[in-house]
Amino acid sequence: MSDITDTTSQASAESSAGDERSGDDRSSATHHGEYRPTPHRRKRRPWRVALVVLGSFLGLVLAVAAGGYAYVNHLVSSIPRVNVAYLAPVTPGSGQTFLFTASAYGPTEPSGLTPSPNYSELFMLIHINANGKAGGAVTIPGDTIVNVPGHGSHPLYYALKTGGPSLAVHTITTVTGVPINHYARIDFNHVAGLVNAIGGVQVTIPKATTAFGQTFHAGVNQLTGVTAVYYARDPSLSQSARTLRQEVLVRDTLAKIGNEHLLTNPLTMVSVLNALTSALTVDSNMTNSEVTSLAKQLGGLGGSAATFVTAATQKVNGKLVLNPAIDNQLWTAIEHDGIAGFAAKYPSTVTPQAA
């Protein structure tokens, strides 16, 4: 009887002690009535879990960033390069000037000219100020009569058609005195893809027109890729009017890229940069980092703060020529990061909102 009492007391004590131990599981009792305590599980501290999650996320971001950088570098490396003479070296601490042309293909070339990448109606000097910010864009109409070195007086587009980018750079440098540091060409065959990549672009048209069967109404028009090209290449317009539309299209496209940060947003950067690089040809002196930097700086040309102007012209003996009384101030303004100041002084040269 004493043995039974002792055994019962011992079991009761063990049971009581077991109740006090963390981790006992009453449901784990064996058929003999014995209890097997489950191992104690240490609670993970929330901050440790957060660190693990954060570390994994950062690792993923870095991997994506590294892959994105490699892909961007691949895109930039694939941009065609062209040898261009007469380019001025970049002076440290000073601004840079780029000559942009737009290769023209399709039914709107002047009679007798064969469509080629060396025919352009758009000649745009884009200036980056010494502080790295976009200074503005200056368009010289392609049908302006200028002195083409070694060829006499011809429309500006003649220089590009006859001697390629080198003669175009030489001609504009001779006429303006502005050193040109780099050259880039936009291929209108790929403008549609670029416009589609940014989700279309809005332009304002002063009166209803029709081009290639596409009707454009007066006011704001939302253009897709193909309709943007139709808008810029309308054969019913004069060459000067088409040049103005191309200038407006470039301005409004860059405005959307810059204002919506499409080149810095990871969700849009690759598609936009892919379309942009597909449309570009640059001079062989431009490094990949310079091309990437240029793409970002071009975004700075977007918005109301951007300055787009057209060189002043006048008719002399029925021919379109530059107006030196005004344009000489413009050339000086480009060299001294003063395009905005020039535009304020000569508002009539500012590119209109509607074209």
Residue positions per predicted region:
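Flexible, polar/acidic helix-loop-strand segments at domain edges
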Residues: 93, 193-275, 280, 355
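C-terminal solvent-exposed extensions
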Residues: 79-81, 106-107, 114, 144, ...
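Second-shell loop/turn segments in exported
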Residues: 109-113, 154-162, 177-182, 233-241, ...
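Extracytoplasmic
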Residues: 93-96, 118-123, 132-140, 151, ...
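Terminal targeting segments of Actinobacterial cell-envelope proteins
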Residues: 1-51
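Amphipathic, coiled-coil-like alpha-helical scaffolding segments used for oligomerization/assembly
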Residues: 157-217
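Entry/capping segment at the start of metal-dependent catalytic domains
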Residues: 3, 38-132
